[in-house]
Amino acid sequence: MGSVQRQDLVLFSDQSVLPAHFFQDSNSHNLFFITHQSCTQPLWMINALVETHVLGSPSSLNESSSSMLPSSTRSHAVLASFIHEQNYFTNSLNKLKIPSNNYNVLDFLSDFIVNNIHNKPRDKILSDVLAKFSAAIQNNPTDTIVIIEQPELLLSLVSGLTCSELNNKFITPLLRQCKVLIIVSNSDIFNIDEYDASVHSSNLQNFYKSSFIKSMINLNLNPLKTGFAKDVTGSLHVCRGGAPIATSNTSLHVVENEYLYLNEKESTKLFYR
């Protein structure tokens, strides 16, 4: 890849990663859906989105970051994960010099089952989880993006929980509370050799399908089909989701593209495929 030109990440037709229109329109609520496999960890993409939102541009990813926005114009990010502890995100964001007062990290991994699920009905569990997000969002509702990693694990953790309940009582209400909701999901289930027809598997697949349908952009992180390479980690496929973009700018659209990316120790580089 040494002779191949490095590219900037561009997701929308205004040459942005997160359009300013998303935060200027009062009724704008947009869903991003990021899928990855266990071998294509999405932390670098999460970092780029937080950096863009707080600092105005993903300068750690893009070499030409000429259109930086003042951080005061869109300032707050809420991150939550069901598979990683708080330090996983704070350590990474500190390296990018993201001010700690511009984001909150909700830890749903440590003692989550004991504190939030044990001996509680499903409705109470979902309302309590939603309340934690509401508390983190309430001071900056017009400037907040929410990134939630693997909410589909609730389908495994909460006995009897269905995809419809998860969407209607958690995902959809959460989307209404923030300007941009970013769901990050592991798609390994679709790579299982023998099809699993269990109710749990069906719920998971329905969740992925519904998330795609409700999203206006889908970002797929995939490993190389040919296996390992020293100069390429995987591919990023950017495509439109099933929902229209919620904005008054009718000309704004997703720029569908495919990149190769290389994860290095302190950075990630993008190249056109």
UniProtKB/Swiss-Prot annotation:
Role description: Component of the elongator complex which is required for multiple tRNA modifications, including mcm5U (5-methoxycarbonylmethyl uridine), mcm5s2U (5-methoxycarbonylmethyl-2-thiouridine), and ncm5U (5-carbamoylmethyl uridine). The elongator complex catalyzes formation of carboxymethyluridine in the wobble base at position 34 in tRNAs. It functions as a gamma-toxin target (TOT); disruption of the complex confers resistance to Kluyveromyces lactis toxin zymocin (pGKL1 killer toxin). May also be involved in sensitivity to Pichia inositovora toxin.
* Superkingdom of this protein's organism: Eukaryota
Q: Where is the signal peptide?
A: none
From the Swiss-Prot or TrEMBL record, state where the protein is found: Cytoplasm; Nucleus
Residues in a coiled coil are: none
Quaternary organization: Component of the elongator complex which consists of ELP1/IKI3, ELP2, ELP3, ELP4, ELP5/IKI1 and ELP6. The elongator complex is composed of two copies of the Elp123 subcomplex (composed of ELP1/IKI3, ELP2 and ELP3) and two copies of the Elp456 subcomplex (composed of ELP4, ELP5/IKI1 and ELP6). The Elp123 subcomplex forms a two-lobed scaffold, which binds the Elp456 subcomplex asymmetrically. In each lobe, ELP2 is tightly sandwiched between ELP1/IKI3 and ELP3. The Elp123 subcomplex binds tRNA through ELP1/IKI3 and ELP3 and can bind 2 tRNAs simultaneously.
Statement: the UniProt record of this protein carries the keyword tRNA processing: yes
Q: What do the Gene Ontology cellular component annotations say?
A: cytoplasm; elongator holoenzyme complex; nucleoplasm
User: Main location per UniProt?
Assistant: cytoplasm
Q: Which CDD domains match?
A: Elp456
Q: Which Gene Ontology terms cover its molecular function?
A: identical protein binding
Q: Encoded by which gene?
A: ELP6
The molecule here is called Elongator complex protein 6
- Give the protein family: Belongs to the ELP6 family.
Pathway field of the UniProt record reads: tRNA modification; 5-methoxycarbonylmethyl-2-thiouridine-tRNA biosynthesis
Write out the entry's keywords from A to Z.
Answer: Cytoplasm, Nucleus, tRNA processing
Listed InterPro entries: ELP6, P-loop_NTPase
Q: Which GO terms describe its biological process?
A: protein urmylation; regulation of transcription by RNA polymerase II; regulation of translation; tRNA wobble uridine modification
